[in-house]
A protein has these predicted regions:
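Surface-exposed short loop/turn segments
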Residues: 42-45, 56-126, 136, 140
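A structural "domain/chain start" motif
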Residues: 1-37, 42-52, 114, 135, ...
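Second-shell loop/turn segments in exported
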Residues: 19-25, 121-131
Length: 150
């Protein structure tokens, strides 16, 4: 361990475009780019393509929700909550080992992550802004998952 929380045995990571099981298109590209930027900015790992990498981080967006939290007297939404749920798998391409130590009832090799944010359209906050906030939070959570457990 280098003292930074990341494994010194890993030098490169491949992050292919996340899959998207929802009807909201384009979010998978935004999330993939955000994860790649987080890896470049916060870890000692270099991004590499496909089989040139030591490890591969894959993800699947399984749910995107926009829920109304409050309405005005005309039943217009005043406060909304936007959330995205993804499953992420990080594997060592040299050994086939899963690098995530978390176990999940859905699929043991996938780690579910969910994050959410609220926004208020009446005061000028948009769904695009809320989407970017959630994507940035998810990217941070995903890269946090890549740290070596104590």
């Amino acid at each position: 361990m280098l003292g930074n929380g990341y494994s010194p045995d890993i030098k490169t990571v491949s992050v292919p475009i996340f899959e998207n099981d929802t009807y909201r298109r384009g979010v998978e590209y935004q999330l993939t780019e955000a994860v790649q930027n987080e890896i470049k900015n916060r870890t000692p790992y270099r991004l590499a393509r496909g089989s040139d990498a030591d490890t591969r981080l894959t993800g699947r967006i399984v749910q995107i929700r926009k829920d109304v939290l409050g309405e005005n007297n005309d039943d217009d939404p005043r406060q909304l909550q936007y959330s995205i749920m993804v499953r992420v798998t990080w594997e060592n391409l040299r050994t086939g080992e899963l690098l995530s130590q978390k176990e999940v009832p859905i699929a043991p090799e996938a780690v579910p992550l969910i994050t959410q944010t609220g926004f208020a359209p009446e005061v000028g906050q948009s769904q695009a802004t809320a989407t970017q906030i959630v994507i940035d939070q998810l990217a941070r959570q995903i890269v946090n998952m890549m740290e070596v457990p104590w």
